[in-house]
């Protein structure tokens, strides 16, 4: 289950996470990863056929006609380049929707003027609403597999804000 840590080191309670998420239109849910995917998701990298198998095992979301699977792992040659790009603070014209299937990451958000880190792992489903400034960082393990749901490709383009990472 997702946890929220503030810059001062304090961890938000479940009630605080719910209140903060509601106030900022962030969706944080837990949707279990199908057990049938365990063997496929255990692989460090996935080819197109394996990625399609993963996507086919998850129900489509009609409101988000496009989806793909992002796989970041130390064995991926461009892993650090991609990870660094996501670490820059940005916003999108459309919602950013992720269903974490394997690994872990951290969505940084600004809550009431204070930076907060939403730690996500397998089964966490998060929607960062359009226009909300955020970033994404890998944990020390440097790996994650997540479905990205898109309403359209244009709304997904990042507008970098210049805030220091």
Curated annotation (Swiss-Prot):
Cofactor note: Binds 1 Fe(2+) cation per monomer. Binds 1 nickel ion per monomer.
Top EC class of this enzyme: oxidoreductase
Site entry (Important to generate the dianion), positions: 98
Cofactor(s) recorded in Swiss-Prot or TrEMBL: Fe(2+); Ni(2+)
Gene3D superfamilies named in the record: Jelly Rolls
Subunit structure: Monomer.
Descriptive protein name: Acireductone dioxygenase
